[in-house]
C-alpha cells in the first residue's frame, strides 16, 4: 500500500465494505444502495471497472465462480484490502474528529 492509495473513492470504499463477506456484482450494488439509503447507486460500468482495479491491486479476490456461467463470480476483500479499508476508516474518523473540535470551539 502506498500513500497514493488514499483517500479511497466513494465507490471503492463501499465496494470494499460490501465485500467483508463473499458477494457478487448485483449483491454489491444492492448492499451499497441499502447502506446509503439509495444515495449511492453504482452503475454496471462503475462497479465492474472498480472491481477490475481492486482485483489488480490485490485488495479483493475472486471467492467463487459459477462453472456454468462465466458471469457469476463472488468476490471477497483480501487482508491487504482490509488494511487499506482500515487506514481509510482511521483517516475519515480523524476528519470527523477535527470537524467536531471546530464546532465545539465555535460555541
What do the PLM-derived regions correspond to, one by one?
Residues 16-17, 30, 52, 86, ...:
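A cross-family signal for key residues in well-ordered alpha-helices
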Residues 1-3:
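Short, intrinsically disordered or compositionally biased N-terminal tails of bacterial proteins
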Residues 70-89:
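Basic, amphipathic "hinge/linker" alpha-helix immediately C-terminal to the N-terminal HTH DNA-binding motif
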Residues 5-46:
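N-terminal helix-turn-helix DNA-binding core of bacterial DNA-binding proteins
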Residues 55-71, 76:
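Beta-hairpin "wing" of winged helix-turn-helix
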